[in-house]
Structure formats: C-alpha cells, structure tokens
Amino acid sequence: MSDVAVGLTADKVCDSALAFESVCRSEKGAGEILSGITARFAASRLVALVGADGAGKTTLMRIAAGILQPSAGHVLVFGEELYGKKLAHLQKQCGYMPQKFGLYEDLSVAENFKLYADLFGLSEEQRKERTKELLEMTALTAFTERPAGKLSGGMKQKLGLACALLNRPRILLLDEPTVGVDPLSRRDLWRILRENAAARDMLIVVATTYMDEAALCDDVIILEEGHMRVTGTPESIARHAQGCTFFAEQEKKELPVRLLQDRLIADTEHLLDAVPEATGVRLLTNGTSDVQKLQALYPGVRFTERPSTLEDGYLVLRKEFLGDWRLEAEESLSLFESSATADSDPAITGNPDSVIHAKGLVRRFGSFVAVDKTDFDVARGEIFGLLGPNGAGKTTTFKMLCGLLEVSEGELCVAGIDVRHAREKARELLGYMSQKFSLYPGLSVLENLTFFAGAYGLTGSRGKQRIAQVLQAFGLETFASRAAGSLPGGYKQRLSMATALLHRPQILFLDEPTSGADIPTRRRFWRWVTALARNGTTVVVTTHFMEEALYCDRILIQDAGKSLILGTPEAVRSGCATMNEAFIRVVTQARHAEADRRKETS
C-alpha cells in the first residue's frame, strides 16, 4: 500500500499529527522487518494497528516513539522530521507505553509518578496537579505507597498509562496495553482512552491482537509481514466478509458447544473460522454461502445469518495475504490424539469421576488470605476454567493445584494423590505452562526441549524420538537452533506447550496460555487443547479472554480469594449477551454485596 491517510481528507493531509514516508527497518539476522510503510494519522483519532505475531507492530511503534531509527524513510511529527535536530523536543510530544508497561517495579506508585515527572521536566506544581488528576482517573489514589511490582496486572496497566499521560502528550502510542488484563480493567482503559482522545485533541495508536478492541477504534490498519496491507474503518473492513457469516446451533443440545466448534473448524473446504459463542458457534465460510447449503452439509445443526464483524473481515483478508493457517494445525493433531492414552496412569483411570478434588482450600501469606475456602472437582477429560480479575486468587489456586505452593488449610487431591503430603509425586503427573512460558531464553529451542526431556526422565533414543515429534507437531523444526528468547510470542507459546507435553502428562495446567497471541495462534492452540481433552487429558486453564471461557466445560469465577460462581459457561452467562458482560456482572455484584456487608457490620 503506497499511501494511507487515516482520518484525513485530501486537503488536510499536510496537517497530520504523525506521518510515515517509505519507512523501512532491517536488522542483522532477521532481514527486513518493515517495508515501505507510508501513512499519515490525524489528531483526535483512535487508531488500531493489528496483525499477526511478527508482523512488525512493535517495531513500527518504537520507530514512532523515537527510540528505534528506521533504516530508510522519514517519520514526521506535526510536520517536522522526528529523527533530526529536534528529536528530544518531538519525543516529548509522544507518550509511549511498551508491552511491559515501562514501570519501575521496586518504586511505589507515587515514586513512579515523581520519576516520570522529573524525566519530563515538569515543575513541582505541574507534577502534583497532574498526578492527582491521573490518580483519580485511574482509581489508584488508595495505592500510592504500594510498590508497582506488587500491583495487580490491571493496576500496573493503569499506572503505565497514567505515567505515559503525565506529560500531556499530543500523540499516545500503546503497544498491546491489555495483554493479561481482566475485562473490568480493559473496560476502564478504553474509557480513559476515548475520554482523552476527545478532550485533548490527541492521536492515540493502539497495537493489539484483539479484534473486539480494534473495533472500538475510529480506524484500523492491518500490518502483515512488515507490509501495510489494508486500512479502513472497522465497518468497512467487516464488509469484506459479507455473505460469509453465520451462527450454528445444535437442534438437540447433546454435545458441549466446544465439540461442535471442533467439528466445524476442521472443515477447511467450506469454513474459514468457527468460534464458540453463547449457545452455539460463530461461523465464517470460505466464500459466500447460504443457510440451505450449510444445512445440507450438517444435518442436525441449525444455521442463521449474522452481521459480519471486524474479526471476520480481517480473517478473510488475512487468508488472501498469508493463506489458511488451519492446514498446519490439522497436520499436527495426530500427536495430541495419542498423547492422553499413551502412558495411562492407574490413579486416573481408576477414578475417572474426580481427577482433581479441592475442598475448603485456603492459602495464607501471613495474615493475608489469598484463597478462602474454595471447593471444586474436575473430571477426567474435562476442560476447567479458573477466571477472575487481576489479583483474584486464580494463580495462587493454580500453584497449589500444581504443587508449587503449600496448602494452608483444606483438602487437595490430584490424580488420587494428597498434594498436601506428596507434592513431588503429584507433579510427575502434571504438565505446566505458565503465562511467562518458563523457558530458558539463552538456550535454543532444541536445547530447551532437551533440558525438559531430561528433567522428565526422557533420555536416549526415547527422548530424541519424543523431541522430534513435538518439533514437528508444533511447527518448530525450522527454529530448532534459534534462541528461545528471540522467538516471536506465538512461537514461544508453542515451545512452552511442547515442553509441557513432552512427558505425556495426564493433567495439563495452562496459566493464561494465549495472552497476547494472535487469532490463528489462539485458534490453533484450542484445537490442540480440545483434542487432548477428547482423548482423556484433564485441562485446567486460567484466562482473561472471555471468548476462551466458552471452550471450557465448566468455569469458576473468583474475586478477592473467594469463589463467586461455578457452572457451565451457558449457566454463568445466563441473562447476558456475552461472557464479558456476565463476568463483569458477577464480579461487580459480589463487590457491591461485600461493600454493603461491611457497611452493616461497621
């Protein structure tokens, strides 16, 4: 695409807040990352930059922020060359929030504000006035003395955004700001962004892999393989999928929705995408279709037309650029079809009804109760979701289940083993994939797999055979000699899951496994998980992405260490249009009830 003017009429192109002119960026060993990017952005616009892992989004954001010089081309900020004599001055016009929020975690909230105020050269009066305003805007006033490293993920996100806004920039650049953040915090962030874009005449550019967020923006730019492919409004991009979007429901609800979804998404001839939604599956067909054709293909399934979304349009366009991602996923499924039954454990097969049993589960850190009297059971082959806001107690519960944290009080059995007394024995049966992926970044992909295989007792020819299997299954063969730390996020996710599955665990624990992953990576990942569960592997997963809760057989929502609701996704969602709405309703109602209780007892 040679020239894109976002939010500008032809006679106003010269008034752009930010402009790229034939921007390229190459790096040694990685080749060309960005190629010929030309675009102009108007003020007072909210712009989404979307694309797959490795598309070049972060590189373009860092170039715009003045911290990574392009190999060729020009970057203009309000008509002036950014990488020239006025670099320092123009950088102050831009607020930048990187993926890790850019916080100093050993400093308190107040100290982070003071440090950023000093870096921006603000006066004492300006610092106090703006800090007060931003603390109120982000609801962080009560946490000024808390170290940033001890804030929940949602609070860190808000603090990072507040620090980026402290200088009152005219351009705000946010690189995947909601990764690992719960729906309540995401809602608050987008409220803040919309208010600032309108009130301060500010250009805001958000890099994201979440299409529901991109749909909230005025304009969307699709970046793939370093090229700017398409730009338009969310509505104009959605129109690329007109005539291809349907909703599918079982006429007799005999199977979980995720199994219907798994059946449909395997149809690479007729369907391009299939995602669980409410009581059925949201479909995207390969080319235009109609209800009658689909009914003939799938007897017993009822189809209705639905409006196309930005995500639908993006997937149609992406197939034109990069082909069909699902073909690779289909080739790798054989590994997962056999994984669960290869080394069947008598403790599990002998007690299929309850592989995990938790009763009155409590975890204390000193006087602080992180998990308070939690009860649940998980069956063999079940996908069980742990949901909750940042700081709700999910990860603490998760670590107790994995034997990584001692249980303070209550009962906990995993695969028939009392975890309170035999944590090491229980861990031998488990696979664990953490949200930070638990990889050794300095080791190559092959070295990571060899290390973990040895840790699981897979040595010699048996270990080599298993490593070869997972390299092929996860599409990692071409990356075998590459350092794990240099992999794109989606490939780090693949490697992390590969290490967790090397020893064919009977129970798989996944802690926010798709956080920040692009759409194909998420779809591919859940195909693997569904195949594992179908063949008997028990899966426990935490996620902040509510669409993924619909892949679960049952979900437990926690907040402040307490269990709020346990049931099927359909039961939890009852009365709400989406799982996002249901999650927010459950948590806010519980918080209001707790606030009322405290008033009554005070």
What are these regions (language model features)?
Residues 114, 118, 125-143, 450, ...:
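Conserved ABC ATPase "signature" region
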Residues 65, 402:
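Helix-to-loop junction immediately C-terminal to a conserved catalytic motif
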Residues 73-83, 89-90, 410-418, 425-426:
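Conserved ABC transporter NBD signature motif
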Residues 50-52, 387-389:
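The feature captures the beta-strand-to-loop junction immediately N-terminal to the Walker
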Residues 172-176, 508-511:
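Catalytic Walker B motif of ABC-type/P-loop ATPase nucleotide-binding domains
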Residues 192-287, 527-541, 546-592:
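ABC transporter nucleotide-binding domain
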